[in-house]
């Protein structure tokens, strides 16, 4: 991508959407032996190589925050939309939310013992990773439906937060909250410093990503849009209202058509 020069013909939404694609454009990490003068000139976005991708980010922010620029964007209109999987957090070898659901299966089966000898729950309980890798999409849908529904929204949020505090990736031996891309954290910080409001639009589960994003990126729930299930309204014995997560799909945010309002 070439550096973006000021031009009255530049589409502001296009400028913002370049941020979604930047990680794929070049290598992100600076060499450990980078000269001192390069580090000094690269105080902004220090984990990025000097090059077209980094310059594009700097140019987007420059031309949209300079009041004398024809591409100036007022404070209330400054938004930056990011994908999540493979952009902000790692997606290989397995999505973090899928790992969470697989690890939730024993607790679900404890409450619903009739699932113990039913596939795909039987395979997950076996701990056989080779067999789990072969599970079909339909199998995963059954697991997600069983592990992500049937509890109140508050209970789900508490469970997800608790898991994120203790779970470790088996390969890296690090919390999943640390398996994010440092260069992109720098982009988020740089945009906030220039009055941009970051949003996440993802095909991942909206409720889980909202918990993760608030903890790791500081992005509040209302700025995260993802695949969402329905909820059922009810009252507790003490008369307090609550929402229970339902298996009904409310928004499938995995297709371009479902995201057209954000482009």
Predicted regions and their residues:
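N-terminal low-complexity, Ser/Thr- and acidic-residue-enriched intrinsically disordered segments
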Residues: 84, 92-95
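Non-catalytic pre-domain segments flanking phosphatase-related domains
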Residues: 2-4, 9-10, 14-84, 106, ...
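A metal-dependent, Asp-based hydrolase signature
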Residues: 94, 99-178, 182
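Secondary-structure junction/capping motif
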Residues: 11, 96, 254-257
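C-terminal cap/substrate-recognition subdomain and adjoining C-terminal extension
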Residues: 35-48, 52-58, 62, 77, ...
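A generic structural micro-environment signature
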Residues: 7, 94-95, 102, 111, ...
């Amino acid at each position: 991508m070439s550096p973006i020069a000021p031009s009255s013909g530049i589409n502001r939404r296009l400028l913002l959407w370049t941020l979604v694609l930047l990680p794929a454009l070049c290598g992100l990490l600076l060499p450990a032996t980078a000269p001192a003068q390069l580090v000094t000139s690269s105080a902004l976005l220090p984990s990025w190589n000097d090059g077209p991708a980094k310059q594009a980010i700097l140019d987007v922010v420059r031309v949209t925050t300079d009041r004398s620029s024809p591409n100036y964007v007022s404070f209330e209109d400054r938004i930056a939309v990011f994908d999540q999987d493979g952009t902000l957090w790692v997606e290989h070898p397995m999505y973090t939310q899928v790992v969470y659901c697989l690890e939730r299966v024993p607790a679900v089966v404890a409450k619903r013992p009739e699932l113990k000898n039913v596939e795909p729950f039987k395979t997950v309980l076996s701990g056989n990773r080779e067999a789990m890798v072969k599970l079909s999409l339909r199998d995963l849908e059954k697991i997600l439906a069983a592990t992500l529904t049937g509890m109140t929204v508050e209970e789900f949020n508490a469970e997800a937060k608790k898991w994120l505090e203790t779970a470790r990736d088996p390969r890296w031996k690090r919390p999943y909250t640390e398996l994010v891309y440092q260069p992109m954290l720098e982009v988020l910080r740089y945009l906030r410093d220039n009055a941009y409001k970051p949003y996440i639009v993802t095909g991942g589960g909206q409720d889980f990503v909202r918990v993760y994003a608030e903890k790791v990126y500081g992005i509040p729930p209302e700025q995260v849009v993802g695949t969402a299930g329905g909820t059922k309204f009810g009252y507790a014995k003490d008369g307090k209202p609550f929402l229970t997560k339902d298996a009904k799909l409310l928004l499938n945010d995995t297709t371009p058509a479902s995201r057209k309002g954000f482009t």
